[in-house]
């Protein structure tokens, strides 16, 4: 329902009449029974009305104040009473206002009391001249737990069943069950100044699921004393709003919070302005630095067997050894066999100092690592890094050379910039990489083909190179053999041709011309020659011939002078 606010002094007036008017007193009682639960911080869903109507109050008020009457009163909007002559014709005042207030009271009573109690006596008649008193509308009781925890923000008085249909009348927290009812109180005089009071947050704006700890049963601020008295009861204390502590947590947002939260206010003094002495503010205690996470620490699980515990237990980061001064002479390099024997006993284990250290484990009882060189690093039992900027990792690994690296058990790198990879590897020459030692060689496997001139080649690249070289050599040798064969054939044919030319007979002394044919064979190569001799003078003679063979043709000419 929407109403307009008016001041408490105006609430006692009706068309300019005094507060003794019966209608004004009834309205004041209804107004008090509806506002007090809101001031105590009760849930707002119990005061929801079924319909919205115009209020005869604050019509034409400054700042154009509109809205629910209860909400406006809680926010401090000044209320102004509208006389009957200014009311609308639709019955927006009088019995309609009483009907709305009865709906609010009935909704509150039904929501917090299930089922509602039957009133002991009928309600007083409503002396309104506009309409007869309406019948209260029954609303469906809201489902609330009977034993909900009290909210830590607002404490509520204990619950007691209602005493009448207009307003429930619970017992005061400090009143006894046999106490006689006290007279009803009315509003104070308009001239009396009231002390400003801090209002709690509006329950109408809070969501029910955000206040799970509110009490499902709300007690009425009105006492069960007689309604004829004009003085307020002595045992009625005004509740004060107390803001929650900074460390106070929402039970719904905090999974580990208890479902039943105790009220921070003491039940013995709800009207006191001083906090109770037995109320202690919870303090936040941070976890210790060495506190373990059960999910991240394997040894915290109760289902780990002793064997698994021995494998998964953490280790202790030992204190680094003391590095000797540069003025001291470093011990000479020795072989691993000359190292001191390992001390008996197992390594000490404890929780690692950081989360990343749990991925490193050391299990050895040998001597400590020793790094004598400048900027040298030695990791492992009895590891020795004696060269400058050297690195020795592994049991009894030894790096003696400058910037040498020895990785593996008993690995030795004594050369300058030498690298010994693997257990027992020895790199004793400068700028070398060793993967073994003489008599205990190793293969370097899974090597990619080399791409640059200084890259290593694998077996596939070597076989391809050999194959290409063999093919080239064979081709060249074949060509050479062919050339030699052809040369021999020509030579043999030439010898046969020359022999065939010499076989032609000469001319006689008494003849002038002679023609002859000759032939010869040399190592399987044959030749045929044709020639002739002519006597030109008595003392002069000329001779010519041609020989033919498989290697080619041969031509010869000769002349002789005789005396």
Curated annotation (Swiss-Prot):
PROSITE patterns: WH2. Residues 473-509 are annotated as: Outer membrane translocation of the passenger domain. GO terms for cellular component: cell outer membrane; cell surface. One of its GO terms (molecular function) is Arp2/3 complex binding. InterPro entries: Adhesin_Head_dom, Coiled_stalk_dom, Pilin-like, Serralysin-like_metalloprot_C, WH2_dom, YadA_C. Residues 1-20, 109-350 are annotated as: Disordered. Keywords: Cell outer membrane, Membrane, Protein transport, Signal, Transmembrane, Transmembrane beta strand, Transport, Virulence. It comes from the Bacteria. Disruption phenotype: During infection of host cells, loss of actin tail formation. The central and acidic (CA) domains are required for binding to the host Arp2/3 complex, Arp2/3-dependent actin polymerization and thus for actin-based motility. The transmembrane domain is required for polar localization at the bacterium inner membrane. Homotrimer. Interacts with host G-actin; the interaction is direct. Interacts (via central and acidic domains) with host ACTR2/ARP2 and ACTR3/ARP3. This is Autotransporter BimA.
């Amino acid at each position: 329902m929407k109403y307009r606010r008016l001041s408490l002094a105006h609430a006692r007036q009706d068309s300019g009449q005094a507060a003794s008017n019966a209608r004004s007193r009834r309205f004041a009682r209804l107004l008090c029974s509806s506002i007090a639960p809101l001031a105590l911080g009760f849930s707002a869903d119990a005061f929801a009305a079924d319909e919205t109507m115009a209020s005869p109050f604050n019509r034409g008020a400054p700042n154009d104040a509109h809205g629910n009457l209860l909400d406006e009163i809680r926010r401090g909007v000044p209320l102004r009473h509208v006389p009957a002559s200014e009311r609308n014709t639709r019955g927006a005042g009088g019995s309609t206002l009483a009907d709305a207030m009865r709906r609010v009271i009935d909704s509150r009573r039904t929501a917090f009391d299930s089922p509602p109690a039957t009133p002991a006596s009928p309600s007083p008649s409503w002396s309104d001249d506009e309409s007869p008193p309406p019948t209260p509308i029954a609303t469906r009781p809201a489902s609330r737990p009977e034993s909900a925890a009290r909210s830590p923000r607002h404490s509520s008085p204990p619950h007691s069943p209602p005493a009448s249909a207009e307003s429930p009348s619970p017992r005061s927290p400090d009143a006894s069950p046999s106490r006689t009812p006290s007279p009803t109180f009315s509003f104070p005089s308009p001239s009396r100044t009231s002390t400003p009071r801090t209002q709690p947050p509006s329950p109408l704006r809070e969501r029910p699921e955000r206040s799970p700890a509110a009490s499902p049963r709300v007690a009425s601020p009105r006492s069960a004393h007689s309604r004829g008295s004009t003085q307020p009861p002595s045992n009625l204390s005004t509740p004060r709003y107390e803001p929650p502590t900074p460390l106070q947590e929402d039970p719904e947002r905090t999974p580990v919070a208890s479902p039943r939260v105790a009220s921070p206010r003491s039940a013995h003094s709800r009207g006191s302005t001083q906090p109770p002495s037995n109320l202690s503010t919870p303090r936040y205690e941070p976890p210790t630095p060495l506190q373990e996470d059960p999910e991240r620490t394997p040894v915290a699980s109760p289902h780990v067997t002793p064997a698994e515990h021995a494998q998964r237990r953490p280790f202790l980061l030992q204190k680094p050894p003391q590095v000797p001064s540069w003025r001291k002479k470093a011990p000479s390099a020795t072989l691993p066999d000359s190292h001191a024997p390992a001390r008996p006993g197992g390594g000490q284990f404890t929780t690692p100092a950081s989360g990343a250290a749990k991925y490193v484990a050391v299990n050895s009882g040998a001597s400590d690592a020793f790094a004598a060189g400048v900027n040298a690093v030695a990791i492992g039992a009895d590891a020795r890094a004696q060269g400058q900027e050297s690195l020795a990792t592994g049991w009894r690994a030894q790096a003696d050379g400058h910037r040498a690296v020895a990785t593996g058990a008993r690995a030795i790198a004594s050369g300058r910039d030498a690298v010994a990879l693997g257990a027992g590897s020895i790199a004793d020459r400068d700028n070398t990489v060793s993967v073994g030692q003489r008599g205990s060689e190793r293969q370097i496997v899974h090597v990619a083909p080399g791409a640059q001139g200084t890259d290593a080649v694998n077996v596939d690249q070597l076989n391809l190179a050999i194959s290409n070289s063999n093919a080239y050599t064979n081709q060249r040798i074949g060509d050479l053999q062919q050339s030699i064969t052809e040369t021999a054939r020509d030579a043999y044919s030439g010898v046969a041709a020359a022999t065939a030319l010499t076989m032609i007979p000469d001319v006689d002394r008494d003849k002038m011309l002679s023609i002859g044919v000759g032939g010869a064979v040399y190592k399987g190569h044959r030749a045929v020659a044709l020639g002739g001799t002519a006597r030109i003078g008595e003392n002069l003679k000329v001779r010519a011939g041609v020989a033919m063979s498989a290697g080619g043709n041969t031509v010869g000419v000769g002349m002789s002078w005789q005396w």
